């Protein structure tokens, strides 16, 4: 695949960088949560890290025929303090993607008729809405010195859709059957 428009290509690189960093940040914060006796919050971080990996991979694959050196600028929370603050950093990052980043990227791709970029931005935007809610629920529990009470976390391997619903039959974003989902 190749992208014809420089602005959409820049947005794909930026989104790739942001999702890549979120992936690593959530893995680190997940380990810290587990080490602080919050195994379910740790598992939630790791599951959502997998979703962010899928988003980064999707963005990358739209540009994979455009191989050249490029700076990737992506602003994000860096570091780690405590569980509550880490969850707030995750919430803030997800809300930035939902309210600012992906709506602009999606509309630009749509305007520039970049169908593959439009698809990957749509997938990420819809999944991030769920991530923000799950992180908020986790933070609410952590503020009460409790781990979040959740069963398995299911991630769609195509779009990164995230759900706690074990009875879901297929992804509501991309249509993939649940038997393909990764469970955490």
Swiss-Prot record:
It holds the Pfam family Rubrerythrin. It is an enzyme of class 1 (oxidoreductase). Rubredoxin (Rd) increases the NADH consumption rate by serving as an intermediary electron-transfer shuttle between NROR and Rbr2. PROSITE patterns: FERRITIN_LIKE, RUBREDOXIN_LIKE. It catalyses: H2O2 + NADH + H(+) = NAD(+) + 2 H2O. Fe(3+) 2 binds at residues 52, 94, 128, 131. Keywords: Electron transport, Iron, Metal-binding, NAD, Oxidoreductase, Peroxidase, Transport. Residues 151-184 form the Rubredoxin-like domain. Its EC number is 1.11.1.1. CDD domains: rubredoxin_SM, Rubrerythrin. Binds 3 Fe(3+) ions per subunit. InterPro entries: Ferritin-like (IPR012347), Ferritin-like_diiron (IPR009040), Ferritin-like_SF (IPR009078), Rbr2/Nigerythrin (IPR052753), Rr_diiron-bd_dom (IPR003251), Rubredoxin-like_dom (IPR024934), RUBY_RBDX (IPR048574). Fe(3+) 1 binds at residues 19, 52, 97, 128. Residues 2-146 form the Ferritin-like diiron domain. Fe(3+) 3 binds at residues 156, 159, 171, 174. Its cofactor is Fe(3+). Induction: Various environmental stress conditions, e.g. oxidative stress (exposure to H(2)O(2)) and other stress factors such as salt, increased pH, high concentration of solvents or cold shock, do not lead to increased transcript levels of this gene. However, PubMed:15336429 shows that rbr2 is slightly up-regulated after exposure to air, but PubMed:19648241 shows it does not respond to the presence of O(2). Is not repressed by PerR. One of its GO terms (molecular function) is NADH peroxidase activity. PANTHER family: RUBRERYTHRIN (PTHR33746:SF4). Functions as the terminal component of an NADH peroxidase (NADH:H(2)O(2) oxidoreductase) when using NADH:rubredoxin oxidoreductase (NROR) as the electron transport intermediary from NADH to Rbr2. This is Rubrerythrin-2.
């Amino acid at each position: 695949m190749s992208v014809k428009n420089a602005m959409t290509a820049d947005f794909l690189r930026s989104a790739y960088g942001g999702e890549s960093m979120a992936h690593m940040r959530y893995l680190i914060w997940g380990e810290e949560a587990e080490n602080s006796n919050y195994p379910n919050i740790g598992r939630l971080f790791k599951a959502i890290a997998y979703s962010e990996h899928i988003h980064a991979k999707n963005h990358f694959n739209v540009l994979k025929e455009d191989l050249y050196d490029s700076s990737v600028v992506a602003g994000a929370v860096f570091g780690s303090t405590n569980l509550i603050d880490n969850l707030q950093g995750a919430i803030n990052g997800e809300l930035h993607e939902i309210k600012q980043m992906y709506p602009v990227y999606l509309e630009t791709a749509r305007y520039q008729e970049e169908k593959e970029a439009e698809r990957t931005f749509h997938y990420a935007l819809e999944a991030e809405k769920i991530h923000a809610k799950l992180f908020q629920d986790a933070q609410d529990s952590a503020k009460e010195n409790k781990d979040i009470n959740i069963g398995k976390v299911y991630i769609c391997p195509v779009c990164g859709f995230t759900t706690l619903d074990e009875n879901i039959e297929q992804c509501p974003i991309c249509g993939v059957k649940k038997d393909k989902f990764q469970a955490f």
